[in-house]
Structures are given as structure tokens and as C-alpha cells.
């Protein structure tokens, strides 16, 4: 009986992967592989479509067909399985100022993001400040950028990884 269970599980796993969008599967596999390597002071950026392509040896850019809020949920779920790192989420403070008239969909986006933040360490900082932190970190640490199909101003989500066994407070 147990000889049948493992092959059945493998077949189901592989058939589930075949149904997934290749771009989705690629960034998720890369993130999963990188989570074993990365630690405190590494970053994950969930970026809107116009986010610049950073250069450098520690920068890896992936593309997702999902929206930023959908990718955030996927990333947070993966991070919850990891004991060695915890997310410190940073969002641009300018996001609060954008109106629905200027950027249709922004209200829904903010609401979706705000539902995921309670119980997690998160901050609002000016976009320029967060970008400086990313540029500094990229000189010494790994930064994984996941570009999404979101096209809303100031909608980038920045996650600095912190030690999972050390309370930063």
C-alpha cells in the first residue's frame, strides 16, 4: 500500500505543476530555492510593472503574471514555512495619497494589502528612502525582484528579511 502512495503523490505534484503558468512556476521555484540560502538583510521586492531593472551580481529579477497583492500573499505564505527568516514589510507612504480618480483600482489594492499586514512587522516610508535602502543592500546582499502585472503608482512592496530566531525589538 505504501509503495503506491509515493508514486501517486509524485504524479499529482507533477500534473499540478504542468497546469501552472510557466512564469508563475519559475519565480516560485526560484524563490523557494533562494529561501534556503538567504537570511537576515536580504530583500524581496514585489514590484509593479515599471520598476527599474537593477544590475548587480546579487540582483535576480523574476516575472509574475499576478498582481502585486496576489504575489505578496504567495510570498508571505512561503515565508511562514521558513523558521530562519521573518519579513519586515515596507510600503511607500505615498500610496496613501493616491486617489481612485488618479489611479483606478488603487483603493482595492490598498485594502487587499492592509488585510495582510496585521500581525506582521510593517512600516510606511517614503519611496525614495526605501529605494535608497534597496540600492545600499544590493551592494552586499541578495535582492530578489518579482515584477508583477500591477500598474499602480507607489504600489511596490519591499520585504527585508530578518532573523527568524531573533526578536528585533
Walk through the language-model features, giving the residues of each.
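Glycine-rich, aromatic-bearing surface loops/beta-hairpins
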Residues: 101-169
